[in-house]
Amino acid sequence: MHAVPTHAASPERLPFYRQLYFQVVVAIVAGVLLGHFEPQYAEQFKPLGDAFIKLVKMIIAPVIFLTIVTGIAGMTHLRTVGRVFLKAMAYFLFFSTLALVVGMVVAHVVQPGAGMNINPADLDQAAVKGYVAKSHELTLTGFAMDIIPKTLVSPFVGDNILQVLFVAVLFGISLAMVGDAGKPVLNFLEALTAPVFKLVGILMKAAPLGAFGAIAFTIGKFGLGSLVNLAWLVGSFYITSLLFVVVVLGFVARLCGFSVLKLARYLKAELLLVLGTSSSESALPSLMQKMERAGCGKSVVGLVVPTGYSFNLDGTNIYMTLAALFIAQATNTHLTLGHEIALLLVAMLSSKGAAGVTGAGFITLAATLAVVPEVPVAGMALILGVDRFMSECRSLTNFMGNAVATVVVSRWENELDYSKLNAALDGEPVQALPAEAAAVKA
């Protein structure tokens, strides 16, 4: 069983006003109030949110690379890498497909678009042309080829997580294969992990500012009132996503011996950060640290979390089928069982090809509708105004899906320390990771 050294002292519990989740809550509330009462002024704070997300993306590649390389190089059997990857992909495929089916079922039961009687010819197709154009770039072959970087260092100057993952896995395997000759390199990378983790901690201190700027801009630009016309669709999506996390992921968590609600409480600071920035990537480095600290194997965390950010998008999948059927209902487009099965199959593929794409949910929806001509792509103009408000829910659901997946795959691999997991989920102070302890000493 994987065990993280526990010689480091447990961190003392901080006063509530110094804890990240409290600071982010205050920032979000302040952003909402400013956006509602001073919308024009609030829009000027957009650079705060953009800057914070850029800062986090700056550190994502080093965190992923160091975590994966040191994890794989420390494995005694390289066959373990392939086994972890296959188990993770099997999990991702099953639950991503289940999320698509859930979105489709809810759309049939709730009928959010029924009675709107929209004529597609009356819609402003120009509003969605940009998204449709980007969707044509999402092909399965192009997606696969894009995983392979042009040079060994190019992934570190781009924003494609899968390229970093690809290089890290290959380098980690190579380092493990050279044995003792690679020890100096491995020791150097393990030492380098300490300042990188320290930098993550420094950047996270700016999270409240980022959340404030992002939410103030969103409310200021789009307004709370913009939700009213399509509140039924938005409400259906939020409730469905909540039920998916609590019921579906909750059932899986219970089978594996933990509570998804306790896991959400443990990750509350990261969830609030995702809510404020509308980007699950903003919490990726912190998620990797926390899952390892909670007893998940380092090698499992290094493989499952970054891969899940591209292949395990439960929230995006629920959104895609729910939104597609909403458009069909709103435009009185009749879909046969064959049409819906085709929609499901296309969505299974297109949802995997949007890693690192801005507005991924909307773009993958355009890609799906472009291949299933029965549903008018122009109908996307109906949800363009409220898509931004559904983005937060997509990101939150995606985030929780990846957190649960990490624990589940760790359990399958017997790389889960239940004593650490239970302590973390019960709110007890947890042992610092070796790299974190070294960073504190530094």
Curated annotation (Swiss-Prot):
Pfam families: SDF
SUPFAM superfamilies on file: Proton glutamate symport protein
Localization annotation: Cell inner membrane
GO BP terms, alphabetized: L-aspartate transmembrane transport
A GO MF term: fumarate transmembrane transporter activity
Membrane spanning residue stretches: 19-39, 55-75, 90-110, 161-181, 199-219, 232-252, 318-338, 366-386
Membrane topology, record value: Multi-pass membrane protein
Domain of life from the UniProt record: Bacteria
UniProt entry keywords in alphabetical sequence: Cell inner membrane, Cell membrane, Membrane, Symport, Transmembrane, Transmembrane helix, Transport
InterPro entries: C4_dicarb_transport, Na-dicarboxylate_symporter, Na-dicarboxylate_symporter_CS, Na:dicarbo_symporter_sf
Any one GO cellular component localisation term in the record: plasma membrane
Function: Responsible for the transport of dicarboxylates such as succinate, fumarate, and malate from the periplasm across the membrane.
Similarity field: Belongs to the dicarboxylate/amino acid:cation symporter (DAACS) (TC 2.A.23) family.
Protein name: C4-dicarboxylate transport protein
